From Swiss-Prot:
Positions annotated to bind Zn(2+) 1: 175, 177, 190, 203
Record domain Fibronectin type-II: where: 225-273, 283-331, 342-390
PANTHER family registered for this protein in UniProt: MATRIX METALLOPROTEINASE (PTHR10201), MATRIX METALLOPROTEINASE-9 (PTHR10201:SF30)
Organism field: Homo sapiens
InterPro entries the record matches: FN_type2_dom (IPR000562), FN_type2_sf (IPR036943), Hemopexin-like_dom (IPR000585), Hemopexin-like_dom_sf (IPR036375), Hemopexin-like_repeat (IPR018487), Hemopexin_CS (IPR018486), Kringle-like (IPR013806), M10A_MMP (IPR033739)
Essential cofactor(s): Zn(2+); Ca(2+)
Additional free-text comment from the UniProt record: In the arthritis patient this enzyme might contribute to the pathogenesis of joint destruction and might constitute a useful marker of disease status.
Protein name: Matrix metalloproteinase-9
Length: 707
């Protein structure tokens, strides 16, 4: 051995001993379903500059096609350092969530005036996001309009028809106007300048988490806070919580503080939970019973088994197979995940990740610092996950900005202005002097004396009086409320309530008008928990049960005055409670008393070769299958558009059913294909659609006597 070798070994050992210890690096994990952008900075800049009008303006000026001139335009418009370079400040601005209206130029498809020529502006809320209670959304829009009416002669009146000047819509991706949204973050909303038709309308990306800017809004029940919303984060026993918790309780009921510090304020309420109540179903809102038996198996949590629409449900007695009583489990915005591979599912706490147990959301395993959770108790084995809710975007502030566009304002270059294109949360007065000057340039000041902007508060859900525990640690089972709502909070109409069934005009009954004497119905649909049967301008209602008979007939025109006498198919989307009525090449959409339509089928993405829609079946959350003859398509209810790639032959998905059915509908979670007086019933077992019964509509479904 060389004389140098021992010395080298000694130096190596000493080097190891005296080297500074390395900082432990977090393990980075590739999460299944994680969407990552592969855009380079240059590609991001090119796309951004084109989308928001800078490239086109630079080219129109005859300037070079390098990014420099367009970057200078952007930097000047956004009040950034004017370097003409793709520097860090410019890239940061490009990555900031913002309005989708171009900064230079307008949505080029539309022409129109830059202001309204009347001062009483009407608006219609066409649909809602599920992120906030409807009352909170209504209030956010009303307060946003109030900002502009406080400094101008304008007034804003809510109406319930598409004739409104400003139609407000939540949508995702391509939502019908040719300017698609881009998923979560990025482009938040857009609006069109004043004018007829779609002009003046404001659209909000429903892939965002809409809040009041300070986290998800979770209304509480019971407790001692009079239904106030949860305050996130809150302190309990010295620890910070950003979601509802069961800590401190022995009954498993999730609760939250309604102030920033429970330890000092002692104010709390219970979060939505299937252990408190259920929604819809047939159990009058009673809470889930765990465990319960379904198809011979025991369940200790809400499940989607047995359903094709993805809704979580539970039995409200110990044995569903025997009692047939159930309800749908309420969702909690504070723990409903976004993205990942389990969007819409709930976080499960505690969960195991890399052998360690987590009782809150974590950023472990990620290089971007985003909080996530598992949606099963063990990520290591199941690999199911999603991002935890963040602070969300203030619907009030974004709406106020978009309504500025709907009134005729362009983007401002003042970073503190409401009309600056980038989202900025503030709890101070939103309007800057630049905003006020701009809107008054169009409409003038409010007539003197000019009142102060009205002070409004967000309405909070009320809770029924109850004997409440003095704090979250415990509650006696007998004190736990069992009465729940008969339907989900979001199930209300977007307009004035429609007249109840008892007010519908009953047509004088004759033997020919008895539903049991109708050979072929025009359309059949399950609406609510009843079966509706339509024929020649009339309809009947049927509730299943021993000795039940169809009620009616009633006039279609009394309940849905916009509809024609002859209908081809009808369906209800359960989540939004929208009713879709198809007749020939047209469709009408009712939301409460409000109606949209008639619209042509091509607006839904169905070609001119589709003469009618003959039926619909649920196909996952917010999705339907639309039928016409031998073909079917997958239909996105929220976007109101079919996926053209989903076209398929009926007999490929539903072997054994007639190919010339005149009506397809869903009833009690099974599919019915009608031909003449008969139906073919299809049930799904092991992901296979199989005909399990053939029968008469009148005798076997409506329980009509056979004499």
């Amino acid at each position: 051995m060389s004389l140098w070798q021992p010395l080298v070994l000694v130096l190596l050992v000493l080097g190891c001993c005296f080297a500074a210890p390395r900082q432990r690096q977090s393990t980075l994990v590739l999460f299944p379903g994680d969407l990552r952008t592969n855009l380079t900075d240059r590609q991001l800049a090119e796309e951004y500059l084109y989308r928001y009008g800078y490239t086109r303006v630079a080219e129109m000026r005859g300037e070079s096609k390098s990014l420099g001139p367009a970057l200078l335009l952007l930097q000047k418009q956004l009040s950034l350092p004017e370097t003409g370079e793709l520097d860090s400040a410019t890239l940061k601005a490009m990555r900031t969530p913002r309005c989708g209206v171009p900064d230079l130029g307008r949505f080029q498809t539309f022409e129109g005036d830059l202001k309204w020529h009347h001062h009483n502006i009407t608006y219609w809320i066409q649909n809602y996001s599920e992120d906030l209670p409807r009352a909170v959304i209504d209030d956010a829009f009303a307060r946003a309009f109030a900002l502009w009416s406080a400094v101008t002669p304008l007034t804003f009146t809510r109406v319930y028809s598409r004739d409104a000047d400003i139609v407000i819509q939540f949508g995702v991706a391509e939502h019908g106007d040719g300017y698609p949204f881009d998923g979560k973050d990025g482009l938040l909303a857009h609006a069109f300048p004043p004018g007829p038709g779609i002009q003046g309308d404001a659209h909000f990306d429903d892939d965002e988490l809409w809040s009041l800017g300070k986290g998800v809004v979770v209304p509480t029940r019971f407790g001692n806070a009079d239904g106030a919303a949860c305050h996130f984060p809150f302190i309990f026993e010295g620890r910070s919580y950003s979601a509802c918790t069961t800590d401190g309780r022995s009954d498993g009921l999730p609760w939250c503080s309604t102030t920033a510090n429970y330890d000092t304020d002692d104010r709390f309420g219970f979060c939505p939970s299937e252990r408190l109540y259920t929604q819809d179903g047939n159990a009058d809102g009673k809470p889930c019973q765990f465990p319960f038996i379904f198809q011979g198996q025991s369940y200790s949590a809400c499940t989607t088994d047995g359903r094709s629409d993805g809704y979580r449900w539970c039995a409200t007695t110990a044995n569903y197979d025997r009692d047939k009583l159930f309800g749908f489990c309420p969702t909690r915005a504070d723990s409903t995940v976004m993205g990942g591979n389990s969007a819409g599912e709930l976080c499960v706490f505690p969960f195991t990740f890399l052998g360690k147990e987590y009782s809150t959301c974590t950023s472990e395993g990620r290089g971007d610092g985003r909080l996530w959770c598992a949606t099963t108790s063990n990520f290591d084995s199941d690999k199911k996950w999603g991002f935890c809710p963040d602070q969300g975007y203030s619907l009030f502030l974004v709406a106020a900005h978009e309504f500025g566009h709907a009134l005729g304002l362009d983007h401002s270059s003042v970073p503190e202005a409401l009309m600056y294109p980038m989202y900025r949360f503030t709890e101070g007065p939103p309007l800057h002097k630049d905003d006020v000057n701009g809107i008054r340039h169009l409409y003038g000041p409010r007539p003197e004396p000019e009142p102060r902007p009205p002070t409004t508060t967000t309405p909070q859900p009320t809770a029924p009086p109850t004997v409440c525990p003095t704090g979250p640690p415990t509650v006696h089972p007998s004190e736990r409320p069992t009465a729940g709502p008969t339907g989900p909070p979001s199930a209300g109409p977007t307009g004035p309530p429609t007249a109840g069934p008892s007010t519908a005009t009953t047509v004088p009954l004759s033997p020919v008008d008895d539903a049991c004497n109708v050979n072929i119905f025009d359309a059949i649909a399950e609406i609510g928990n009843q079966l509706y049967l339509f024929k020649d301008g009339k309809y009947w209602r049927f509730s299943e049960g021993r000795g039940s008979r169809p009620q009616g007939p009633f006039l279609i025109a009394d309940k849905w005055p916009a509809l024609p006498r002859k209908l081809d198919s009808v369906f209800e989307e359960r989540l939004s409670k929208k009713l879709f009525f198809f007749s020939g090449r047209q469709v009408w959409v009712y939301t409460g008393a409000s109606v949209l339509g008639p619209r042509r089928l091509d607006k839904l993405g169905l070609g001119a070769d589709v003469a009618q829609v003959t039926g619909a079946l649920r196909s996952g959350r917010g999705k339907m299958l639309l039928f016409s003859g031998r073909r079917l398509w997958r239909f996105d209810v929220k976007a109101q558009m079919v996926d053209p790639r989903s076209a398929s032959e009926v007999d490929r998905m539903f072997p054994g059913v007639p190919l010339d059915t005149h009506d397809v509908f869903q009833y009690r979670e099974k599919a019915y294909f009608c031909q003449d007086r008969f139906y073919w019933r299809v049930s799904s077992r092991s992901e296979l659609n199989q005909v399990d019964q053939v029968g008469y509509v009148t005798y076997d479904i409506l329980q009509c006597p056979e004499d």
